[in-house]
Amino acid sequence: MNIFCKIILPLLCIISCSERKEIEVYNMELDENKKEVLVEIRNNTENNYYLLSPIVSIMTKHLQYIDGEMIEGQIHHKKLDSIVCSVYIWDDICKEEYYAMHEIVLLPKKSVKKIKYKYDNEEYIEIVHIGFPYNGYYNEIGKKMQFMLKKKLDSSNIIKGYEFYDKDIETMTIKM
Protein backbone atom coordinates (compact mmCIF):
# COMPACT_ATOMS: atom_id res chain seq x y z
CA MET A 1 0.00 0.00 0.00
CA ASN A 2 2.84 2.39 0.80
CA ILE A 3 4.46 1.87 -2.63
CA PHE A 4 1.09 2.53 -4.29
CA CYS A 5 0.69 5.88 -2.50
CA LYS A 6 4.27 7.01 -3.16
CA ILE A 7 4.81 5.90 -6.76
CA ILE A 8 1.71 4.77 -8.61
CA LEU A 9 -0.80 7.37 -7.38
CA PRO A 10 1.36 10.40 -8.37
CA LEU A 11 2.13 8.74 -11.71
CA LEU A 12 -1.59 8.24 -12.41
CA CYS A 13 -2.27 11.88 -11.54
CA ILE A 14 0.47 13.10 -13.91
CA ILE A 15 -0.86 10.96 -16.76
CA SER A 16 -4.50 11.99 -16.27
CA CYS A 17 -3.67 15.68 -15.83
CA SER A 18 -1.49 15.81 -18.94
CA GLU A 19 -4.29 14.47 -21.16
CA ARG A 20 -6.62 17.37 -20.41
CA LYS A 21 -6.62 20.02 -23.14
CA GLU A 22 -6.47 23.76 -22.40
CA ILE A 23 -9.69 24.46 -24.32
CA GLU A 24 -11.90 21.57 -25.38
CA VAL A 25 -15.32 20.80 -26.76
CA TYR A 26 -16.82 19.18 -23.69
CA ASN A 27 -20.24 18.20 -25.03
CA MET A 28 -22.45 18.62 -28.08
CA GLU A 29 -26.15 17.77 -28.33
CA LEU A 30 -28.72 18.01 -31.10
CA ASP A 31 -32.38 18.74 -30.34
CA GLU A 32 -34.23 17.95 -33.57
CA ASN A 33 -37.58 19.07 -32.14
CA LYS A 34 -36.34 22.60 -31.37
CA LYS A 35 -33.87 22.51 -34.31
CA GLU A 36 -31.03 23.54 -32.02
CA VAL A 37 -27.50 22.39 -31.34
CA LEU A 38 -26.02 22.93 -27.87
CA VAL A 39 -22.22 23.04 -27.65
CA GLU A 40 -20.33 23.18 -24.37
CA ILE A 41 -16.73 24.37 -24.46
CA ARG A 42 -14.54 23.94 -21.39
CA ASN A 43 -11.68 26.27 -20.44
CA ASN A 44 -9.34 24.25 -18.20
CA THR A 45 -6.83 27.07 -17.77
CA GLU A 46 -6.27 29.87 -15.27
CA ASN A 47 -6.69 32.47 -18.06
CA ASN A 48 -9.75 34.16 -19.53
CA TYR A 49 -9.88 33.62 -23.29
CA TYR A 50 -12.20 34.37 -26.17
CA LEU A 51 -12.83 32.52 -29.43
CA LEU A 52 -13.85 33.94 -32.78
CA SER A 53 -16.84 32.53 -34.64
CA PRO A 54 -17.00 28.83 -33.78
CA ILE A 55 -19.07 27.27 -36.58
CA VAL A 56 -21.57 24.42 -36.43
CA SER A 57 -22.05 22.59 -39.74
CA ILE A 58 -24.91 20.17 -40.22
CA MET A 59 -25.06 17.58 -42.98
CA THR A 60 -28.40 16.16 -44.07
CA LYS A 61 -29.08 12.72 -45.51
CA HIS A 62 -28.93 14.24 -49.03
CA LEU A 63 -25.37 15.49 -48.33
CA GLN A 64 -26.53 19.08 -48.08
CA TYR A 65 -24.50 21.20 -45.65
CA ILE A 66 -26.13 23.95 -43.65
CA ASP A 67 -24.54 26.22 -41.05
CA GLY A 68 -26.15 26.75 -37.70
CA GLU A 69 -26.78 30.33 -36.59
CA MET A 70 -25.41 31.14 -33.14
CA ILE A 71 -28.34 32.33 -31.02
CA GLU A 72 -26.98 32.17 -27.47
CA GLY A 73 -23.57 32.54 -25.82
CA GLN A 74 -21.94 35.21 -27.99
CA ILE A 75 -21.16 38.91 -27.98
CA HIS A 76 -20.20 41.33 -30.79
CA HIS A 77 -17.66 44.15 -30.87
CA LYS A 78 -17.18 46.57 -33.80
CA LYS A 79 -13.54 47.42 -33.08
CA LEU A 80 -12.58 43.76 -32.73
CA ASP A 81 -14.43 43.02 -35.96
CA SER A 82 -12.51 45.71 -37.82
CA ILE A 83 -9.18 44.30 -36.55
CA VAL A 84 -10.13 40.82 -37.78
CA CYS A 85 -11.10 42.27 -41.17
CA SER A 86 -7.77 44.13 -41.42
CA VAL A 87 -5.97 40.75 -41.29
CA TYR A 88 -8.49 38.44 -42.98
CA ILE A 89 -9.57 40.74 -45.81
CA TRP A 90 -11.21 37.96 -47.85
CA ASP A 91 -13.45 36.83 -44.99
CA ASP A 92 -17.11 36.86 -46.13
CA ILE A 93 -18.18 38.84 -43.06
CA CYS A 94 -15.70 41.57 -44.02
CA LYS A 95 -17.25 42.16 -47.43
CA GLU A 96 -19.39 45.27 -47.74
CA GLU A 97 -22.57 43.47 -48.73
CA TYR A 98 -22.67 41.60 -45.42
CA TYR A 99 -24.06 43.27 -42.34
CA ALA A 100 -23.01 40.55 -39.94
CA MET A 101 -20.28 40.60 -37.33
CA HIS A 102 -17.96 37.92 -36.01
CA GLU A 103 -19.31 36.08 -33.00
CA ILE A 104 -17.11 36.35 -29.93
CA VAL A 105 -17.39 33.63 -27.30
CA LEU A 106 -15.98 34.51 -23.87
CA LEU A 107 -14.40 31.60 -21.99
CA PRO A 108 -13.82 32.56 -18.34
CA LYS A 109 -11.07 30.61 -16.58
CA LYS A 110 -11.94 27.16 -15.21
CA SER A 111 -15.46 27.15 -16.64
CA VAL A 112 -17.78 25.57 -19.18
CA LYS A 113 -19.42 27.90 -21.72
CA LYS A 114 -22.69 26.91 -23.38
CA ILE A 115 -23.32 28.05 -26.95
CA LYS A 116 -26.58 27.45 -28.78
CA TYR A 117 -27.08 27.28 -32.54
CA LYS A 118 -30.35 27.27 -34.48
CA TYR A 119 -30.88 25.71 -37.89
CA ASP A 120 -33.83 25.54 -40.24
CA ASN A 121 -34.04 22.30 -42.11
CA GLU A 122 -36.75 19.68 -42.37
CA GLU A 123 -34.51 16.87 -43.59
CA TYR A 124 -33.07 14.12 -41.46
CA ILE A 125 -29.76 15.14 -39.91
CA GLU A 126 -26.82 12.79 -40.48
CA ILE A 127 -23.82 14.62 -38.99
CA VAL A 128 -23.27 17.67 -36.75
CA HIS A 129 -19.76 19.17 -36.57
CA ILE A 130 -18.21 22.10 -34.68
CA GLY A 131 -15.14 23.80 -36.12
CA PHE A 132 -12.93 26.74 -35.22
CA PRO A 133 -11.92 28.74 -38.31
CA TYR A 134 -9.53 31.09 -36.46
CA ASN A 135 -7.63 28.42 -34.54
CA GLY A 136 -4.78 26.05 -35.35
CA TYR A 137 -3.50 26.84 -38.84
CA TYR A 138 -1.02 24.36 -40.26
CA ASN A 139 0.24 26.12 -43.41
CA GLU A 140 2.79 28.94 -43.21
CA ILE A 141 0.53 31.71 -44.55
CA GLY A 142 -2.23 30.77 -42.10
CA LYS A 143 0.23 30.69 -39.19
CA LYS A 144 1.56 34.16 -40.07
CA MET A 145 -1.92 35.63 -40.35
CA GLN A 146 -2.98 34.01 -37.09
CA PHE A 147 0.14 35.41 -35.38
CA MET A 148 -0.63 38.91 -36.74
CA LEU A 149 -4.25 38.66 -35.61
CA LYS A 150 -3.32 37.53 -32.09
CA LYS A 151 -0.71 40.28 -31.79
CA LYS A 152 -3.17 42.99 -32.92
CA LEU A 153 -6.06 41.73 -30.78
CA ASP A 154 -4.02 41.21 -27.60
CA SER A 155 -2.21 44.56 -27.92
CA SER A 156 -5.51 46.41 -28.39
CA ASN A 157 -6.91 44.80 -25.20
CA ILE A 158 -10.44 45.30 -26.53
CA ILE A 159 -12.07 42.83 -24.17
CA LYS A 160 -10.60 43.70 -20.80
CA GLY A 161 -9.21 40.72 -18.89
CA TYR A 162 -9.49 38.35 -21.88
CA GLU A 163 -7.03 37.31 -24.57
CA PHE A 164 -7.60 35.77 -27.97
CA TYR A 165 -7.15 31.98 -27.96
CA ASP A 166 -5.38 31.04 -31.18
CA LYS A 167 -4.16 27.51 -30.48
CA ASP A 168 -5.65 24.43 -32.08
CA ILE A 169 -8.91 23.15 -30.60
CA GLU A 170 -9.93 19.59 -31.27
CA THR A 171 -13.22 19.57 -33.14
CA MET A 172 -16.16 17.31 -32.37
CA THR A 173 -18.49 15.48 -34.74
CA ILE A 174 -21.62 13.54 -33.81
CA LYS A 175 -23.28 11.08 -36.15
CA MET A 176 -26.96 10.36 -35.86
Stretch-by-stretch model annotation:
Residues 29-33:
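Short, solvent-exposed loop/linker segments at the N-terminal edge
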Residues 35-37:
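Structural beta-strand segments of beta-rich domains
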Residues 39-48:
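Asparagine-centered strand-capping/turn motif at beta-strand->loop junctions
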Residues 105-119:
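Short Pro-Gly-centered flexible turn/kink motifs
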Residues 1-26, 39:
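Bacterial Sec-dependent N-terminal signal peptides
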Residues 142-176:
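Short beta-strand elements
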Residues 120-148:
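Short, surface-exposed ligand- or partner-binding patches at beta-edge/loop junctions that are enriched
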Residues 48-107:
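The feature marks short-to-medium sequence segments in extracytoplasmic or secretory-pathway proteins
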